[in-house]
């Protein structure tokens, strides 16, 4: 061995494997305002201390690897490493812990949700020291939030574009989601928009299939929009799904929508990917298009309470990547969503500053530094009897989206939309008069039925409908 090698070997380097907690568990650490903070629900393997499991997550999602390496000496680990700085047991759960990890801001590329997730969740979920791992929440510091454009327009700009104020917006997903020709699809859009809706919508898997190519659908839907606008005097829209197999094709479809003069396009942000979504968001801001976001595939990631990622994290990521609407669950329909938890991430989408509130699943105070807000979209198994609860729960800055609850009306599409619009207007008027929607909702709807036969027919059809099931999977 050369003298030079002997000297290097004697200065602070010892080959081999050592416990992660010796380097990455730092309970004395005081977090910085610029740190990205993460709350992981960790289920360690039997015999693995929570400190070691939490430190392993911090290491493998930042600077660490399974063994000591020479090149550790070429940088400052104290500056760049992630730190597990606090651990607390999960109440009511054996061998589960919330491990809090702080990441220095320099670890992340500016304006890239893709890079942020690649670092924080890209490699740690298959790690042997943990039996299961779930990312419950992230604190995005203002210093990092300001590197993102965020939503193309935001809530106030959308209301100004649509000239609609003081009530939730109404939408409808065209059904059947697959199989209609472009002309029949456009006909259904027209009937719904003419009947009183603000928006109609492509479903998440409507792209460009043999039975209906995207360009044909765009043209017939644009015709429906213009005809309905001329007859109602209201601004209308249809979420034209621009999701495609390549980013170039996606932008081409969005550009065609812009040429048609329609107000809004749509993207499946999880299946399409964050890089594609951010690119489309930039295009939409530059070209005056609103951007509706569908969360297709989210339950693959967020439904299990012990493993994966909570939707509040995906919601924060969407606000950073860019979108003016996103589906958020309903609390009352066919898709899962517990009320306080749902309202927690709805606030994270809409508000500028959100206080820590563990009862609603919010682990960190979040300051968005004036980033535009996102409108939550309630959809999935909802109908006219749900209108009072939806109006009370989601408030004005929301889209209430009825698919089967519109197109399933016994008299057809237009009467179905009229029923929904009358129910909404009745609930908004009652709320503005000071009535309690939660307690008096059914009476309000029944009273409105007296002057709307369409609503009366809808109430009769769906009076017995309930979506029963076990309690929500998510727990605090």
UniProtKB/Swiss-Prot annotation:
Its cofactor is Mg(2+). It is found in: Plastid, Chloroplast. One of its GO terms (biological process) is reductive pentose-phosphate cycle. The keyword Disulfide bond applies. The disulfide bond which can form in the large chain dimeric partners within the hexadecamer appears to be associated with oxidative stress and protein turnover. Mg(2+) binds at residues 201, 203-204. The record marks 334 as: Transition state stabilizer. Keywords: Acetylation, Calvin cycle, Carbon dioxide fixation, Chloroplast, Disulfide bond, Lyase, Magnesium, Metal-binding, Methylation, Monooxygenase, Oxidoreductase, Photorespiration, Photosynthesis, Plastid. The modification N6-carboxylysine is found at residue 201. PANTHER family: RIBULOSE BISPHOSPHATE CARBOXYLASE, RIBULOSE BISPHOSPHATE CARBOXYLASE LARGE CHAIN. Heterohexadecamer of 8 large chains and 8 small chains; disulfide-linked. The disulfide link is formed within the large subunit homodimers. This is Ribulose bisphosphate carboxylase large chain.
């Amino acid at each position: 061995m050369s003298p030079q090698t002997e000297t290097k070997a004697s200065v602070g380097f010892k080959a081999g494997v050592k416990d992660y907690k010796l380097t990455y568990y730092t309970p004395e650490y005081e977090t910085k305002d610029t740190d990205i903070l993460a709350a992981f629900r960790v289920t360690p393997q039997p015999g693995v201390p929570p400190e070691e499991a939490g430190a392993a997550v911090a290491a493998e999602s930042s600077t660490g690897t399974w063994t000591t390496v020479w090149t550790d000496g070429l940088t400052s680990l104290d500056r760049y490493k992630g730190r597990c700085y606090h651990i607390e047991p999960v109440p009511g759960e054996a061998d589960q812990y919330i491990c809090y990890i702080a990441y220095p801001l320099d670890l992340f590329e500016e304006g890239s949700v893709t890079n942020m997730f690649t670092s924080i969740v890209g490699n740690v979920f298959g790690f042997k020291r943990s039996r299961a791992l779930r990312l419950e929440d992230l604190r995005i510091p203002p210093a990092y939030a300001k590197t993102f454009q965020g939503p193309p327009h935001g809530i106030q700009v959308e209301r100004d574009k649509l000239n609609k104020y003081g009530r939730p917006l109404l939408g409808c997903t065209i059904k059947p989601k697959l199989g209609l020709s472009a002309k029949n699809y456009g006909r259904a859009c027209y009937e719904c928009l003419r009947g009183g809706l603000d928006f109609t919508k492509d479903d998440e898997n409507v792209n460009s299939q043999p039975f209906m190519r995207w360009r044909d659908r765009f043209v017939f839907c644009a015709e429906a929009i213009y005809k309905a606008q001329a007859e109602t005097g209201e601004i209308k829209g249809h979420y034209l799904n621009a999701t495609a197999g390549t980013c170039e094709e996606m932008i081409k479809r969005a550009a065609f929508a812009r040429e048609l003069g329609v107000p809004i396009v749509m993207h499946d942000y999880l299946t399409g990917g964050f890089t594609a979504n951010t690119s489309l968001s930039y295009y939409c801001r530059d070209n005056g298009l609103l951007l509706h976001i569908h969360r297709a595939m989210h339950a693959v990631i967020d439904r299990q309470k012990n493993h994966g990622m909570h939707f509040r994290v995906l919601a924060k990521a969407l606000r950073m990547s860019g979108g003016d609407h996103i589906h958020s669950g309903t609390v009352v329909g066919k898709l899962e969503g517990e009320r306080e938890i749902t309202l927690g991430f709805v606030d994270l989408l809409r508000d500028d500053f959100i206080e820590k509130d563990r009862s609603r699943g919010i682990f960190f105070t979040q300051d968005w530094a004036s980033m535009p807000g996102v409108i939550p979209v309630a959809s999935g198994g909802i109908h006219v009897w749900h209108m009072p609860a939806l109006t009370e729960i989601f408030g004005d800055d929301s889209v209430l989206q009825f698919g089967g609850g519109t197109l399933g009306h016994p008299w057809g599409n237009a009467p179905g939309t009229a029923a929904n619009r009358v129910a909404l207007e009745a609930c908004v008027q009652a709320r503005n008069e000071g009535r309690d929607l939660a307690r008096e909702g059914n009476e309000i709807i029944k009273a409105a039925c007296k002057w709307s036969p369409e609503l009366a027919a809808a109430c009769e059809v769906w009076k017995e409908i309930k979506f029963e099931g076990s309690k929500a999977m998510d727990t605090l």
